[in-house]
Amino acid sequence: MNEYIDKTYWIAVAHLPKWTTERTNRFIIQIIHENKMSWADFFELDKKGWKELFAFTEKELSDLEYAKNDMPRLAFIAEQLQNEGFQIIPINSSDYPVVLKENLKIKSSPPVLYIKGRKGLLQEDAVAIVGSRKAGAKALEFTDHVAKKSVKEFKVVVSGFAKGVDKQALDSTIEANGKSIIVLPQGILTFQSGFKKYYEPIVNGDVLVLSTFFPKAGWDVGLAMARNAYIYGLAKEIYVAESDSKGGTWEGVIDGLKRQRKIYVRYPEPKEKNANLKLVELGALSVNMDGKIVASKVMPSKELFEPVSKNEVKEPSATYEDGKRDIENDILELLNKGTYTTKEILLALKLDWDSRKLTNFLKKNPNIKVIAGKPAKFTRNDLISPSLFG
């Protein structure tokens, strides 16, 4: 198949209207990996065919039909991307950065990356340096120090191409002859002035430009906020130069802390007005101007991320027990290995149940996912296809 035709399908799938990232990723797993279909084969089907084979909602069927009818327009965009030297990296590609999947999981990993530059930078250890657009002198000095320190350690610096900290991180990295990834808050085809400005480092393989949004999408506040998760997701280390108590940097750090990420925040000077100390209270690690961990006088707060209290009464999860045998556990252990029909489960576990009883149990169990088809198959709800999220 012509390469840009295949990429056309990926553009269509990645930007289905109002589909969440998780829903899109589960759709990709369902079609590509569970059903072993190509996108060409899938879109050969009509609405009736999709309805017979898959458990799509009416809205999803309409969205897929719209995407199918939109293919001619998307094909022109795919061809333009190819002709202008852009690359499209789908989530099932070996070029897709493993660290992004590890950090964002199936829920938030973008289905497609649009890039320009040396794609090998996506596989190198990376450091994110983030902060306010209106950062003070100390924050910019910190950014400069951490960027140049990262270059000496042969790490890629990831930033978001906003004013303030982002721009300082990029400029300091280039000045030190380092490598950088720019994560855009817009479609990659709308960044023409940036490509002209950074033409030389891009061509030399020192700068890679990346977007996850529709190629022709203009800059947007919502996209800028969404982009922050990808900056954090691409990095193994995250440094915060300066944060307000709201906005993109703050939201990104809070999200990172909830994901149990280690986040390093510059310890502010006494008269500075920012939310850096509050982030330390919430569990971030305080660092000095050189990015080295320092003892903090602020005690971490336990409000946001406190585990369930020992005194809290929790209703135990129900299990199906047959004599001394925990059948539910046996079924879940089997489903850890892959997908099975009701008949295959009965045979593998030698259960003294009829098919209807087992099917009812499987459909009602919150840990089990139903894969539509004839016959239906079952797997663990939290089981992620190793070829996508290994």
Regions of interest found by a model, annotated:
Residues 1-10, 17-18, 45, 91-390:
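Glycine-biased, small-residue-rich flexible motifs in mid-sequence functional cores and linkers
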